């Protein structure tokens, strides 16, 4: 689910996912619930007032980075070229940064909300 950021639609989706995924019934099959980082939205939360995205789990996406960039470029209305936070360059840079935090060439950060072990 999206991390609760400035985008009102992302906040609504986050709240809906939190309600729909409550582990209150027997046999709940959701083993992992994690929030993802959203380029150009997650970093706009007000510092020290609202929670800012801090990943506590980074997945190695080195083998998938080119596919991720290609998929991202399919959403033309969401791209801010050439140097915006929603550019292919920024997506790649964020993957390099998140990967460097965990020893991968490219990584994608998540914040684990709930995990059943």
Where are these regions (language model features)?
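Metal-dependent de-N-acetylase/amidase catalytic core
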Residues: 1-117
């Amino acid at each position: 689910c999206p991390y609760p950021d400035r985008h009102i639609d992302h906040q609504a989706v986050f709240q809906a996912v939190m309600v729909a995924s409550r582990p209150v019934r027997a046999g709940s099959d959701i083993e992992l619930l994690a929030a993802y980082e959203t380029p150009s939205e997650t970093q706009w939360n007000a510092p020290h007032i609202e929670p800012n995205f801090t990943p506590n789990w980074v997945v190695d996406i080195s083998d998938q980075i080119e596919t991720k960039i290609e998929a991202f470029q399919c959403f033309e209305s969401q791209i801010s070229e050439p140097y915006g936070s929603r550019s292919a360059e920024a997506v790649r840079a964020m993957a390099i940064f998140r990967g460097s935090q965990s020893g991968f060439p490219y990584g994608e950060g998540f914040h684990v909300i709930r995990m059943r072990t």
